[in-house]
Amino acid sequence: MQILLCGPAAGYEAEHTARLFFPTADKTDSIPENGDFVAACSHEKTDFALLRLDGRLYWRTALRDTDTDAEYALCRALYTLLCDATKRTPPWGMMTGVRPVRIIHDLRAMGWQEDAIRDRFLRHFACTPEKFRLA
């Protein structure tokens, strides 16, 4: 498996979203002629995720509003594609390399209520209820 990233929003988070599903994948600068790969590409208002797995192609495209976080939108498209194609859902959802407890403390410090924090974890990060209870 190889990972291809392109565009301004395709950086650390997109790479590590792909690594949730393919932890040993190598990064590449171009689409390989053969073999499996996952690509995450962002443009000014468009996000595109493409997966070639076992000879089959899967893809997802999305238009993005200018006020939407480009990095999150790309990662969400990539994550959804990879969940659908692999039939796997990581228990911590889209969370990559962050400490959930710190996010909870930060949100509380900003005045968020517990229901809003839970909703953020379950919907925004796609975290399972069981993992949220651990945090």
Predicted regions and their residues:
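Flexible, acidic/Gly-rich N-terminal and inter-domain linker regions that tether
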Residues: 1-135
